[in-house]
């Protein structure tokens, strides 16, 4: 399966994280704290383009919400 950016994914998709941006230390800490690291599984629970936010459910069953701007920087592969 081909890697693509998270902002292109629809709700209900089960994914594996391939890459997260590492140049912003605060953002990287947020990803680590929320278990959003390469090879981790996530599910897109909501993709609200009109609001500009995407909601994920992580491996440890935590909901994480962030902007499409951030989602563009995360590369994923569909299961």
Each model region followed by its residue ranges:
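Short, charged, intrinsically disordered terminal tails
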Residues: 68-79
């Amino acid at each position: 399966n081909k890697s693509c950016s998270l902002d292109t994914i629809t709700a209900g998709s089960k994914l594996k994280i391939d890459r997260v941006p590492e140049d912003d230390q605060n953002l990287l800490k947020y990803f680590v704290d929320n278990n959003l690291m390469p090879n981790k599984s996530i599910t897109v629970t909501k993709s609200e383009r009109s609001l500009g936010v995407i909601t994920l459910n992580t491996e440890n069953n935590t909901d994480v919400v962030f902007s499409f701007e951030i989602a563009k920087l995360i590369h994923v592969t569909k299961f």
